[in-house]
From Swiss-Prot:
The gene is GUCA1C. Retina. Stimulates guanylyl cyclase 1 (GC1) and GC2 when free calcium ions concentration is low and inhibits guanylyl cyclases when free calcium ions concentration is elevated. This Ca(2+)-sensitive regulation of guanylyl cyclase (GC) is a key event in recovery of the dark state of rod photoreceptors following light exposure. This is Guanylyl cyclase-activating protein 3. One of its GO terms (molecular function) is calcium ion binding. It comes from Homo sapiens. Ca(2+) 2 binds at residues 101, 103, 105, 107, 112. A lipid is attached at residue 2 (N-myristoyl glycine). Residues 187-209 are annotated as: Disordered. It holds the Pfam family EF-hand_7.
Length: 209
């Protein structure tokens, strides 16, 4: 289990001592060593969601399940924690891209981005932009060859060159509350104050390195 590639590539690792604490906590919660999708949603308090919101959470879980066996084991779980603690926005964008690329073909089309936007909208509430406005804005700015699809290179480079667009994308796909529960709610050595700012959780810093 957990032998797939890490979620975000070359990311900052959790210190060894903290990893041991995480491991004990994970095994206390999940004695089998595996977390199911239902347990993931229970952990986050995300029961009774509508279909669109459920789709978004399912996709988040699937990106954590790197070896695609239907479970999240400890190595996959700690990789997710590493991502949350990662300060490099480029690494987060790589994960965003993987999240939006629903069919896993290495590119994002308008329908995939639209589906994910609407799923997050159902989870987080109404956005400033309509789904159509958001999709048109993103593709107008960063679909360099106008083929109706975004490659990973186009996605990351486009965001790096347009801070305003980066802010819009970050806010429009803000699932920091979902991820923060994992980080703050399950790590004994960290603060668990629900009012903790996104910056302190490493989620609100929109910067490229």
């Amino acid at each position: 289990m957990g032998n797939g590639k890490s979620i975000a590539g070359d990311q900052k690792a959790v210190p060894t001592q903290e990893t041991h604490v995480w491991y004990r906590t994970f095994m206390m919660e999940y004695p089998s060593g595996l977390q199911t999708l239902h347990e993931f949603k229970t952990l986050l308090g995300l029961q009774g969601l509508n279909q669109k919101a459920n789709k978004h959470i399912d996709q988040v879980y699937n990106t954590f399940d790197t070896n695609k066996d239907g479970f999240v084991d400890f190595l996959e779980f700690i990789a997710a924690v590493n991502l949350i603690m990662q300060e490099k926005m480029e690494q987060k964008l790589k994960w965003y891209f993987k999240l939006y690329d629903a069919d896993g073909n290495g590119s994002i089309d308008k329908n995939e981005l639209l589906d994910m936007f609407m799923a997050v909208q159902a989870l987080n509430g109404q956005q400033t932009l309509s789904p159509e406005e958001f999709i048109n804005l993103v593709f107008h700015k960063i679909d360099i060859n106008n083929d109706g699809e975004l490659t990973l290179e186009e996605f990351i480079n486009g965001m790096a060159k347009d801070q305003d667009l980066l802010e819009i994308v970050y806010k429009s796909f803000d699932f920091s509350n979902v991820l923060r529960v994992i980080c703050n709610g399950k790590q004994p050595d960290m603060e668990t104050d629900s009012s903790k700012s996104p910056d302190k959780a490493g989620l609100g810093k929109v910067k490229m390195k």
